[in-house]
Amino acid sequence: EKAILKAVPHVIGRTDWDRQALAVLNPKATYHYGGEIVRDVFYEKKDRQMSKDRPVITTTISFPTYKGYDVILKVANILKNEVGLDFEWNVYGNVQPEFMEKHTGLKHENLNINLKGVASAEVLRDSLLKSTLYFHSSYVENSPNSVGEAQLVGIPVVASRVGGTDSMVEHGKTGFLYPVTDPYMAAYYIKRLIDNKEENMAIGKKAREIALVRHDKRQIVEELLDVYEQIKK
């Protein structure tokens, strides 16, 4: 990837982080902004149906270690065994838990974590609508579609402050950002959103408003066509 970035004259990106990375690796390249279209079902306006039984946290993840499954285990352990919180944490995606659970000494079965496997967009959307918040755990990231999809649904996001996530989540307004190596800070923001329903709803509403603009299909297509025209010149 570095070799390609150093060689190409034009690059499309969408975050402060990828713009700055390009400026370091290839300052002569022209940077073009280009948004991302996400899956259709997440654009639909649906009312939230937060569980009244106990808080529900949702995360979408995959098996590479840099996606932060260990972060989920550590935060869940703090919430359950140090805070004494009763919650449900649904983790979707192709998770292979054995390595990180052995490494951390923490088992998902003991921490209210449900490994749900790969799910359709509709199933994930419905799960998000019932959730108190979306949690993003990655160590390496640029512009995660999962964060954008959660924001489009209208739920607040607690995300690791890595790569380009701070271009998607405005801290305190459309979600909260935490240092990826600090599970206590992550636990604090989760508990804050659980304890303060009014703030939770307000942040979710604002997140959807911003996400609808960021992921606007027509605007993204127009911007991309404009980029192509610029490159042709």
Q: Whereabouts are the PLM-identified features?
A:
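Acidic anion/phosphate-binding donor-loop and adjacent secondary structure
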Residues: 23, 37-54, 101, 126
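Conserved acidic donor-binding segment of nucleotide-sugar-dependent glycosyltransferases
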Residues: 171-172, 176-183, 192-197
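Aromatic "clamp/platform" in nucleotide-sugar-dependent glycosyltransferases that forms part
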Residues: 139
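Short hydrophobic beta-strand element within catalytic cores of glycosyltransferases
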Residues: 156-159
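A short, well-ordered alpha-helix in the C-terminal region of glycosyltransferases
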Residues: 185, 192, 199-214, 220-226
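Conserved donor-binding/catalytic core segment of Leloir-type glycosyltransferases
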Residues: 48-67, 73-76, 90
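Nucleotide-activated donor-binding/catalytic signature segment of Leloir-type glycosyltransferases, i.e.
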Residues: 101-122
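Membrane-proximal helix-turn-helix segments that form the acceptor-binding/catalytic region
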Residues: 1-10
